[in-house]
Amino acid sequence: MGEQPIFSTRAHVFQIDPNTKKNWVPTSKHAVTVSYFYDSTRNVYRIISLDGSKAIINSTITPNMTFTKTSQKFGQWADSRANTVYGLGFSSEHHLSKFAEKFQEFKEAARLAKEKSQEKMELTSTPSQESAGGDLQSPLTPESINGTDDERTPDVTQNSEPRAEPAQNALPFSHSAGDRTQGLSHASSAISKHWEAELATLKGNNAKLTAALLESTANVKQWKQQLAAYQEEAERLHKRVTELECVSSQANAVHSHKTELSQTVQELEETLKVKEEEIERLKQEIDNARELQEQRDSLTQKLQEVEIRNKDLEGQLSELEQRLEKSQSEQDAFRSNLKTLLEILDGKIFELTELRDNLAKLLECS
């Protein structure tokens, strides 16, 4: 097409099985480049992928297309024009998301382009209908001629209805066959000019495509010549390398043996260094173990001393408990004796009180 890709990525390409409509059929043995292109001639966006010189994807993006993510690394879309469903397997979820974003972006661009094309058609058809007395249909644009089937179908539907109306619309404005003939003549002239312009556009596009094809053919021939020259140079260098290998085989053997010895010595030195480091580590561990043993012995001795001290304290505690019990017993006996004395004292006091009262009575009587 001559355009540069807008966005490219790599993926494994699949198509739905036309028989079962369920299974995926791989169309590429390995990951291939899948690119978005903008066709300025037809004002459309395309998805194109080549496997060598074979086009395995050539899909025009239309506003009614939808790209669906069916898994983290796989997506698909249906192309009604090609009557198939394409599937792409990506190496990562990021690549899939990026491709889906671009698909949505170019789908929106295709929708806007289609709306602009329809607006242009309406603006162009309005003056034509007025000048012909409502006798002309909407002229076709290059986009409607060169676009997809989805884009062309609405144009045919819209333009098919006015074809049956020119005579009816012309009746209120003309009442003679001469006027109708003149209107048809003007309409035919306008349509002829329009198709002449379309033909010139198509010829220009054909010339561009022919030039691009010739350029591609010339490039292929040039690449084939360069490839042949590279192959001859590679064969010559291969022969030269073989000769040099034969001449320097002995030197290479000595050098190889020397290299092996050097590597062996280096490996032994590294092994010895590792062993020395291991010995130092073991010595350090032994010293640490000795220190731990000394600390353990010291702690064991302290523990024994603490246990002896604990036993002494337990003996003292037992003796104090016995003394406390004895003291409590003595205190209880003292309290009992004291209570007995208080009771005796109360009795004596009562007797003395009675004696006093009796003496007082005697004194009063005498």
Swiss-Prot record:
Record bears the keyword Phosphoprotein: yes
Modified residues (N-acetylglycine): G2
Signal peptide: none
Keywords, alphabetical: Acetylation, Cell projection, Coiled coil, Cytoplasm, Phosphoprotein, Synapse
Tissue: Highly expressed in cortex, Purkinje cells of the cerebellum, hippocampus, striatum and olfactory bulb. Isoform 1 and isoform 3 are expressed in skeletal and cardiac muscle.
Effect of G89A: Eliminates binding to both GRM1 and SHANK3
Xref: CDD domains: EVH1_Homer_Vesl
Domain called WH1: residue spans: 1-110
Molecular-function GO term, any one: protein-containing complex binding
UniProt xrefs under PROSITE patterns: WH1
Database matches in SMART domains: WH1 (SM00461)
The protein's assembly and partners: Tetramer; this tetrameric structure is critical for forming the high-order complex with SHANK1, which in turn is necessary for the structural and functional integrity of dendritic spines. Interacts with GRM1, GRM5, ITPR1, DYN3, RYR1, RYR2 and SHANK3. Interacts with IFT57 and OPHN1. Isoform 1 and isoform 2 encode coiled-coil structures that mediate homo- and heteromultimerization. Interacts with SHANK1; forms high-order polymerized complex with a mesh-like network structure, at least composed of SHANK1, HOMER1 and DLGAP1; the complex formation is SHANK1 multimerization dependent.
Protein name: Homer protein homolog 1
Record gene name: Homer1
